[in-house]
């Protein structure tokens, strides 16, 4: 069983297949991503779907859109089948839904069920909510077996990390919860954290109360359109699967994760004023971390770390108010929405901008306005958004053609002007922020034979203005190819190749010399799941090269890694897994990645450079239906250095080991 999610009582292969697919996508999205993102909310929601599957006879379009392996046409056909033929009597009626292929059905089965729906059902009574609602408490403790240099005199707290999460929910109707977190090195019930945890998140979310489709109080997240104006949700991107290039609007959602930046605090609501028209409004007022000098905000601090006095001085340094709304019309094959947002800083934001960032956000207030749209004509689906603001504009369009359930084509065009500002916008691109980027992306996915699947994509992009380590306007290419072979349910393998070409300043020339860089990545992965076992072997090869400052000699660097993963689920409620990784790279540019199973609602994809190996062991024990205990131990051993890290994070010696523990109580 995948530890980051928890599955209902179905066959091992059925529950593992969609979870392994999700692991693959998250791993690919993590690799090379400059912006760290925690997937806690998304993983928690999918885990809840495994325990409380969606009833297909009462499913809404938004509920089905949370499953990335379902296409828009499959969702519409599934809803139409229930509308035309009435309630399903068995889950196997999925085979009768047009465009629903066997592979998709296998992926969907763990998340759905079929139950009779009574006519005239309304919002549940308070008595039912209190009686049948479910409570969950999740406690986590991380213990490092090393001492960083910062603990000698700079870090203000102990080296332990711990968090506590409580959630009460009743189906999709009501969710209430609180989250507290203390990072390693932060004080606890002391100094600037006299109230205990360094970070707290409170949330209250009601859904489907008559015309009131959603009401959020406390901390919440927002996503509308394609993210050009507003998205604090998990963003999809370029992977070896077409499903991760599509984005479905999340609307208003709770914020229960330990992410200390990507959320709003206040009130938000969505009302269905007409059968086909929804109106949303929101207001947020929150303190944010940053540096304030002479009454001006010079930088925004996003990490949430407050370990040293210097970091603590950045805590709650200024306030940000946000107000805005969205109006969405959706009927049949047409969907049109308008989103607007206005930001107010309590003092001027004047960052000390480098030349490559001279057009970035600054000022005391600004706005964004955008219009998103979606239209389906036969097998064509057109989705897009156009946005503008205080500066610049952005445009994104996707055209997808579904020849059948086995053949798909996708074309994406994006134009993000170099001076377009958005504080909480994320969208498709080489970087997640929709600014200073233009490009065309073409992808094709085909399953011509029962056991074979092919994917290929080509992204040609350009940056109209400078970027970090690129001291001129530049361009690049990103090409991907993957072939997957699945001879039987318990055995699958794939090979993929990725080629990326970009321009970059030559090291040591201060930007005076800029040459292309060429990056080749190859991966082979074999997964075998006999009975209660899972075996997975991964082999990676990286090749990185750039011409020297004179343009004559290529500087070549290489990296390798081999990872072996094994897990076993006992007949009683105990599962164990072990993983070992060997890596050998020439430098940071040729670094490799190896994902590991983490604790519940977490995902871990560390990068490695240099020479060494890492091993980890994971254990899960369900003491009863109410209590679950997880533990993970891991150690990395470097063979080419005597210290790990630098500055306050420096660790003496060549070994880094830690123990993570988690206890969940459900009732």
Summary of predicted features, one role per range:
Residues 7-205, 210, 219-223:
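Compositionally biased linear targeting/interaction segments
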Residues 181-199, 253-260, 313-316, 544-554:
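Outer-membrane beta-barrel proteins
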Residues 60, 71-74, 101-104, 171, ...:
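Residue-level recognition of beta-strand termini and adjacent short loop/turns
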Residues 194-289, 403-422, 573-588:
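Outer membrane beta-barrel
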Residues 155-159, 264, 316-351, 358-667:
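Exposed, low-structure sequence patches enriched in small/polar residues
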Residues 275-282, 286-323, 328:
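Internal alpha/beta core interface subdomains
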Residues 236-247, 292-309, 597-602:
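Surface-exposed loop/turn segments flanking beta-strands in extracellular/periplasmic regions
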Residues 1-12, 667:
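Bacterial Sec-dependent N-terminal signal peptides
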């Amino acid at each position: 069983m995948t530890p980051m999610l928890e599955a209902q009582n179905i066959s091992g292969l059925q529950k593992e297949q969609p979870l392994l697919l999700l692991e693959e996508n998250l791993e690919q999205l993590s690799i090379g991503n400059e912006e760290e993102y925690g997937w806690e909310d998304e993983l928690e929601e999918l885990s809840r779907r495994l325990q409380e599957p969606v009833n297909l006879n009462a499913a809404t379009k938004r509920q089905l859109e949370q499953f990335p392996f379902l296409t828009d046409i499959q969702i519409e056909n599934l809803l139409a089948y229930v509308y035309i033929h009435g309630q399903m009597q068995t889950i196997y009626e999925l085979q009768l839904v047009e465009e629903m292929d066997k592979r998709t059905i296998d992926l969907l089965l763990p998340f759905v069920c079929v139950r009779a729906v009574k006519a005239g059902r309304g919002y549940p009574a308070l008595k039912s909510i209190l009686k049948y609602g479910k409570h969950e408490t999740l406690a986590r403790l991380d213990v490092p077996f090393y001492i960083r240099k910062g603990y000698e005199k700079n870090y203000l707290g102990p080296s332990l990390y711990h968090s506590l999460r409580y959630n009460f929910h009743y189906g999709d109707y009501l969710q209430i919860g609180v989250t507290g977190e203390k990072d390693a090195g932060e004080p606890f019930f002391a100094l600037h954290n006299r109230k205990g945890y360094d970070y707290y998140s409170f949330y209250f979310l009601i859904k489907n109360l008559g015309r009131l489709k959603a009401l959020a109080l406390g901390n919440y997240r927002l996503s509308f359109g394609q993210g050009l104006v507003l998205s604090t949700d998990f963003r999809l991107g370029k992977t070896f699967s077409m499903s991760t290039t599509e984005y479905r609007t999340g609307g208003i959602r709770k914020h229960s994760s330990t992410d200390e930046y990507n959320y709003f605090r206040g009130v938000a609501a969505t009302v269905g004023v007409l059968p086909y028209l929804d109106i949303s409004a929101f207001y947020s007022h929150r303190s944010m971390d940053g540096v304030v000098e002479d009454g001006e905000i010079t930088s925004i601090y996003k990490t949430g770390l407050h370990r040293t006095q210097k970091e603590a001085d950045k805590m709650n340094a200024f306030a940000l108010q946000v107000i805005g709304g969205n109006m969405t019309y959706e009927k049949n094959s047409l969907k049109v929405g308008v989103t607007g947002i206005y930001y107010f800083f309590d003092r001027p934001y004047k960052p000390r901008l480098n030349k490559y960032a001279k057009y970035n956000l600054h000022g005391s207030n600004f706005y964004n306005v955008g219009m998103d749209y979606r239209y389906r004509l036969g097998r064509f689906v057109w989705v897009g958004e156009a946005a503008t603001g205080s500066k610049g504009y952005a445009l994104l369009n996707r055209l997808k053609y579904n020849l059948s359930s086995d053949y798909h084509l996708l074309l994406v065009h994006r134009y993000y002007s170099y001076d377009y500002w958005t504080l909480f916008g994320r969208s498709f691109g080489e970087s997640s922020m929709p600014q200073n980027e233009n490009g065309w992306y073409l992808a094709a996915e085909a399953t011509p034979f029962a056991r074979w699947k092919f994917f290929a994509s080509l992204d040609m992009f350009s940056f109209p203005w400078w970027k970090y380590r690129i001291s001129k306007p530049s361009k690049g290419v990103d090409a991907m190819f993957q072939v997957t072979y699945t001879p039987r349910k318990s055995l699958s393998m794939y090979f993929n190749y990725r080629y990326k070409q970009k321009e970059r300043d030559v090291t040591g020339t201060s930007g005076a010399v800029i040459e292309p860089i060429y990056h080749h990545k190859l991966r082979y992965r074999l997964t075998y799941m006999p009975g209660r076992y899972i075996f997975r072997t991964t082999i990676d090869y990286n090749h990185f090269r750039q011409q020297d400052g004179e343009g004559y000699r290529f500087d070549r660097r290489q990296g390798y890694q081999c990872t072996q993963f094994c897990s076993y689920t006992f007949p009683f409620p105990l599962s164990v897994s072990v993983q070992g990784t060997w890596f050998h790279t020439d430098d940071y540019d040729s670094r490799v990645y190896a994902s590991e199973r983490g604790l519940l609602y977490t995902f871990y994809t560390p990068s490695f450079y240099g020479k060494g190996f890492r091993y980890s062991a994971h254990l899960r024990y369900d003491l009863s239906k109410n209590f679950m205990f997880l533990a993970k131990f891991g150690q990395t051993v470097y063979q080419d250095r005597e210290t790990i890290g630098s500055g306050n994070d420096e660790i003496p010696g060549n070994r880094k080991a830690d123990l993570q523990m988690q206890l969940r109580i459900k009732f």
